[in-house]
Amino acid sequence: MERADNSNLEMLLETDWQLHQVYTGENIFFVIAKLGWLKTLHTLNVLIDEEIKPWLQQRNKLGDTCIHVAALANRGKQAIQLIEKLVEYGANLNTRRNCNGDTVLDIAVKNKDHELTVWLWKQPSINLQTEKFFHYVMDQMKLKESQENKMEILEAYMMQLFK
């Protein structure tokens, strides 16, 4: 289920980002990703430059980047749209979490977010060099009643294996 995008630009402008980053290790992209504020993320487009892009690779106190937070806090279409925009701005789909080495794809698999998992499999830059994905595919194949859904899962998986 998608959350409403209740973007609050005023709150973001009033935040002391230096202090916030000292306590949490999080910059504005983490907050936007956590709250699912896609509209606000789109408005930042004009501000993204070479000086801002490194913020997309910063890690919070838990060792996550904003792209991990987007996958952890959101599901389905909302997660896809946030991650897509963060990648467009310069985030890396294959960055691993410091706490357990998971990528965004690992998070999607663990959260059983089928929509996000299939979308990630279709991304040309995604790294599938882990057996978690094979087990996920097999589990999904067992669960799916519809032949069409089975084919979608297999097709996405096979596309990535042979790209």
UniProtKB/Swiss-Prot annotation:
ANK repeat windows: 62-95, 100-130
Keyword set, alphabetical order: ANK repeat, Host-virus interaction, Inhibition of host NF-kappa-B by virus, Repeat
GO molecular function per UniProt: NF-kappaB binding
Function in brief: Suppresses the host immune response through NF-kappa-B inactivation. Possesses ankyrin repeat domains required for NF-kappa-B binding but lacks the regulatory regions required for dissociation from NF-kappa-B and degradation. Therefore, prevents host NF-kappa-B release and subsequent activation.
Family: Belongs to the polydnaviridae I-Kappa-B like protein family.
Keyword Lipid biosynthesis on entry: no
Domain of life the protein comes from: Viruses
Organism of provenance: Microplitis demolitor bracovirus (isolate Webb)
The protein's name in its UniProt record: I-Kappa-B like protein N3
GO biological process, one term: symbiont-mediated suppression of host NF-kappaB cascade
InterPro entries per UniProt: Ankyrin_rpt, Ankyrin_rpt-contain_sf, NF-kappa-B_inhibitor
